[in-house]
Amino acid sequence: MKILVVDDEQDICEILQFNLETEGYEVDTANSAEEAMMKPLENYDLIMLDVMMGEMSGFQMARKLKDNANTADLPIIFITALDDEDNTAKGLNLGGDDYISKPLSIKEVKARVRAVLRRTTQHNKQVDDNTDY
């Protein structure tokens, strides 16, 4: 499974990359939404996306992903210090699959990543099982 971590804090990217790689995931990082948008996003199984970044926010990037047919079904976990009800609801309403508040608990991050990927994998299997060939 391939994960892209997008956060303007390099330390967060490195911590998440190290810990998720120890779980067996292949992890790439980007320090801005603009940098992330230049990657072949359809090749990832999950995007972990900081909300507050420079030019383009995580919410803006999520909107672009959901508006593109190639990335519309890509799961998103928002990571943010904006730990309030309005921002959580906004992220989920934009198509986010989960919302994790900073400071991060690595144990919680790993569990949430597993849960989102498990749901996505099960959904994709159901779609495949229901497809007539």
Outline where the language-model segments fall.
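Short, Lys/Arg-enriched segments at the junction into DNA-binding effector domains
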Residues: 2, 118-133
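Active-site residues of response regulator receiver
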Residues: 7, 50, 80
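Two-component/phosphorelay signaling modules centered on CheY-like receiver
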Residues: 10-28
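The feature encodes the CheY-like receiver
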Residues: 13, 53-54, 72, 84, ...
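Short hydrophobic/Thr-rich beta-strand motif most characteristic of the beta2 strand and flanking loop
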Residues: 24-31, 35, 39
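Active-site beta3 strand of CheY-like receiver
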Residues: 43-49
